[in-house]
Amino acid sequence: METMRDIKRRINSIKNTQKITKAMKMVAAAKLKKAQLKAENARPFFEKTRSILIDVARRTRQKDIHPLLREKENNRSLFVMITADRGLCGAYNARVIDRVKKLTEKEDEVNFLAVGRKGRDFFGKRGYNIISEYINIDDYPDYSLAGKIGEEIISLFLDDVVDRVVLVYTYFNSAISQEVRDLTLLPLTPPDDKNQEEGKINTEYLYEPSPEAVMDILLPSYIKNILYSALIEAKASEFGARMTAMDAATDNAGELIDKLTLSYNRARQAAITKEITEIVGGAEALK
């Protein structure tokens, strides 16, 4: 049975931990606000690029296929996975890793481009080929990082090092809801024209010097836009997951402190009762 001193030591230790988790929750909440704003501001730009790609792809569909759209015969896959550099964010990293494990089960040859330390460490320690890694990512990634990653995977695809590129990341819905998503980056499949299916009128654009020339610039840009969107969505999701996890940890610490305080008070009451009983017993013996 624990002594009063042991219980008191545990209470103080948990209180110190609670201070840390509460501080981490507040920091994550502050970072989340800015990251969420960046993610929401980037979505309209991404959607506009997407709509232009739909229109250009529709005009060039009957012509020579672009190298970034061409499917290959082999099955050498590159998985671009975005995880966090640190833990203490609930199941955020585990969900991404689980999705990647499921996607790679039936792959012939698997390679990784790891964004974030946690994903790199998990698959690197298990003998997988990490072609490239990006760690110590800023809290608010800029477009240059997406551009660098985009150039690398486009080069790997065009040089026939890999035949398919799959992106796995976490989409931010809210502070308590994040969704792991995966999509094939290369060969790139132009998104469907949903407006056309619904009978809506599309704006006609004139592309100079030609739709094909625009496609040469637009496709790499579209890939980089997807990556940038994924990076900032993932960061917002990480902060949301960490804030939620630290909030739960703070609450759990409070509950444990209450239980231990109750145990301490009971032990103290028992000790006082025992001491009083001994005093009364001694007094009776002296009579």
Swiss-Prot record:
It is a peripheral membrane protein. It comes from the Bacteria. GO terms for cellular component: plasma membrane; proton-transporting ATP synthase complex. It comes from Halothermothrix orenii (strain H 168 / OCM 544 / DSM 9562). F-type ATPases have 2 components, CF(1) - the catalytic core - and CF(0) - the membrane proton channel. CF(1) has five subunits: alpha(3), beta(3), gamma(1), delta(1), epsilon(1). CF(0) has three main subunits: a, b and c. GO terms for biological process: proton motive force-driven plasma membrane ATP synthesis. The gene is atpG. This is ATP synthase gamma chain. Coiled coil: none annotated. GO terms for molecular function: ATP binding; proton-transporting ATP synthase activity, rotational mechanism. Belongs to the ATPase gamma chain family. InterPro entries: ATP_synth_F1_ATPase_gsu, ATP_synth_F1_gsu, ATP_synth_F1_gsu_CS. The lineage of its organism: Bacteria, Bacillati, Bacillota, Clostridia, Halanaerobiales. It is found in: Cell membrane. Keywords: ATP synthesis, Cell membrane, CF(1), Hydrogen ion transport, Ion transport, Membrane, Transport. Produces ATP from ADP in the presence of a proton gradient across the membrane. The gamma chain is believed to be important in regulating ATPase activity and the flow of protons through the CF(0) complex. Pfam families: ATP-synt.
